[in-house]
Amino acid sequence: MPRLSPVNQARWARFRHNRRGYWSLWIFLVVFSLSLCAELIANDKPLLVRYEGQWYFPLVKNYSERDFGGPLATTADYQDPWLQRQLENRGWVLWAPVRFGANTINFATTQPFPSPPSAKNWLGTDANGGDVFARILYGTRISILFGLMLTICSSVMGVLAGALQGYYGGKVDLWGQRLIEVWSGMPTLFLIILLSSVVQPNFWWLLAITVLFGWMSLVGVVRAEFLRTRNFDYIRAALALGVSDRDIILRHMLPNAMVATLTFLPFILCSSITTLTSLDFLGFGLPLGSPSLGELLLQGKNNLQAPWLGIAAFLSVAILLSLLIFIGEAVRDAFDPARAV
């Protein structure tokens, strides 16, 4: 692992000095790691089955009922009481801590949906009978992955546009600014809702739509940095020596611009997650049935008699966004040369 430069060591020290941001980063990483392992935590399939001396791995392979002594060739339903008794009597089963997946309905409950928290459903069930904890866990993974991909794609486009405008200036900068002014003046949320209502959205289509309108946040920052550094002596010397524009942009100017850019990334990630949550809450986000924090918020609004729905969804979104804001503040302070440990 390469050692950090003295400048980056000082930045890391300033970041660690901000205890709220430092621990928020660790908590966020733990939450994200748990969400990536959602199938091992909440799943309606066994993690491992030992049946009549053979090993079975339902998480990675589909088995039929005949594989476990059943009469049908259909896919095994591990929620079937008969199959559960069959597996337990002739072997043993390793289950996830929560025996419900993102779309598993708890038919065994005796209470109407949404049902309150219980020993089986830690946070209760939603209006469709799904386990709230499982849907929050899977929904958190989708939200973070969507936010990360939107942040990366929009940042790359924004940095590229800002670099070209700031480096070349003149007509390139003029026409680029006019395009951004027109594009940023459009009602983004309404356009996303309009496009989502015309085309049946999925994860990738929704990501493409939001990237289309979300790439302008970093253009101004990168453009300003390039306009500031383009007249520095070392840039003029590189031009005089015949260094290509590509090498000057990527090797000499972009690192300076990235210092300011990195401080915005946690806030862009926070905004990206908020965008997906808002679209899901309004009903124009992920397809129906997808685990979503926004959809749980909508269910909480429509089922005020079941406060556990709204409270669980609200706390999940609030904690996730608060962690990112605290991380962003710590990163901003760490890259501020005026601050000292």
Positions of predicted regions on the chain:
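Gly/Trp-centered helix-boundary motif
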Residues: 1-155, 159, 163-164, 289, ...
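Alpha-helical transmembrane segments of integral membrane proteins
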Residues: 125-341
